[in-house]
């Protein structure tokens, strides 16, 4: 049981870090773009974060199957 918890926690951390990297990349481009691009890029960053959370949930579910 402890091994499953460790695997699930590691998968969650990895997914969150991946989401943070994609969000940070979008924020870096926001500094030099126009306001209209910031809005669309913000939506893309929000979608990336949502995908990261969903990926973490899937990874945790798969880890508990084993």
Swiss-Prot record:
> Keywords in UniProt for this one?
Cell membrane, Glycoprotein, GPI-anchor, Lipoprotein, Membrane, Signal
Topology with respect to the bilayer: Lipid-anchor; GPI-anchor
Where is it located? Cell membrane
- Signal sequence bounds: 1-18
Q: Which ranges are cleaved off as propeptide?
A: 43-66
Which residues are covalently lipidated (GPI-anchor amidated glycine)? 42
Keyword DNA-binding attached: no
Q: Does the record bear Membrane in its keywords? A: yes
Question: Which positions form S-S bridges?
Answer: none
GO cellular component terms attached to this protein's record: endoplasmic reticulum; plasma membrane; side of membrane
Where are the annotated glycans?
20, 24, 27, 30, 33
Q: Where would you say this protein principally sits, based on its record?
A: membrane
Q: Which residue spans traverse the membrane?
A: none
Q: What is this protein called?
A: Uncharacterized protein YDR524C-B
The scientific name of the source species is: Saccharomyces cerevisiae (strain ATCC 204508 / S288c) (Baker's yeast)
């Amino acid at each position: 049981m402890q091994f499953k918890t460790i695997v699930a926690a590691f998968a969650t951390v990895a997914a969150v870090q991946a989401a943070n990297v994609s969000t940070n990349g979008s924020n870096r481009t926001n500094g030099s773009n126009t306001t209209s691009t910031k809005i669309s890029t913000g939506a893309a960053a929000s979608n990336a974060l949502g995908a990261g959370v969903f990926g973490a949930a899937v990874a945790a579910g798969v880890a508990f199957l084993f």
